């Protein structure tokens, strides 16, 4: 249990990412100064946890000094491609907390193999704005399974977090809020209902975000009706993410940034570029400033002034997706029923 009495508890998955860090600091800024907050940082590795906690502490001192004595830090080591790791995280939270106020599902994983540079050049020449809004030149590996014999991207981005929520639902009951971070690129075209684990998909990351959209629309009403939990769906727009930097050199990185700013100048509302602006929708949702029956996007004007966009989603197939996830959940409940884990091992 938190050392801070009656503290507000927030769990942010993928906190060490650009978006995760900015969700954390914006949430701290958005909560009242008299609120004591326990921020549960998550990552797959202990060094990343230590680094992001240090970065958030520095931000608090520099930008929100009124929160210096109001924030307590905790951490979870969790890998959503490992069901035993998810079970371990559940045990830790269940031991330490009686209630969780905010859960941000921000952790995301792709199985990228690089960039089709010929395709990238052609896309940029033919339609530069589309090339940096809905790119098709990012190469993704096909058929990658996790150690649990599930589609790796499906497990990391959809089923792993879904199962995690299933396990900790009692901690979120009666007022807890869940914020799922989806993507601008989650069109129905990326998902085949004959391949829900995305093992045959050449766009498994985008397909996983389509699954997140459908899962939300198939569950948010029931969560609120039966458990008093409010669930929201958001996307951060387009911003500089650390995950793809390994495929860029200094020239291609600044070329990408130039095209981002050009797209924004030409009227794209989604090229936020800044991780801080990208975190607007996730935090606004957590603070009750968005609707549950739509997808809310972080957006900005040409000058970088942030605002929110509401997007309607085609929810056809949401019941089928939830049924599939629930069947898998029951299977893994059975597989893990005798599992005992040592939970704080880095």
Curated annotation (Swiss-Prot):
Q: What happens when the gene is disrupted?
A: Leads to complete loss of both 3-keto reductase and oxidosqualene cyclase (performed by ERG7) activities, compromising all sterol synthesis.
| EC numbers | 1.1.1.270
The family line of this record is: Belongs to the short-chain dehydrogenases/reductases (SDR) family. ERG27 subfamily.
Name the GO cellular-component terms.
endoplasmic reticulum membrane; lipid droplet
Query: Topologically, how does it sit relative to the membrane?
Result: Single-pass membrane protein
**What does the UniProt entry say about where the protein is found?**
Endoplasmic reticulum membrane; Lipid droplet
Q: Which InterPro entries match?
A: Ergosterol_Biosynth_ERG27, NAD(P)-bd_dom_sf, SDR_fam
Q: Where does the record locate the signal sequence feature?
A: none
Which positions are glycosylated? 272
Q: Whom does it interact with, and what assembly results? A: Heterotetramer of ERG25, ERG26, ERG27 and ERG28. ERG28 acts as a scaffold to tether ERG27 and other 4,4-demethylation-related enzymes, forming a demethylation enzyme complex, in the endoplasmic reticulum. Interacts with ERG25 and ERG28. Also interacts with ERG7, but only in lipid particles.
Q: Gene encoding this polypeptide?
A: ERG27
What induces this protein's gene, according to its Swiss-Prot or TrEMBL record? Answer: Expression is increased by itraconazole (which targets the lanosterol demethylase CYP51/ERG11) and by zaragozic acid A (which targets the squalene synthase ERG9).
Q: Quote the Pfam families the UniProt record gives.
A: adh_short
Under what name is this protein listed? 3-keto-steroid reductase ERG27
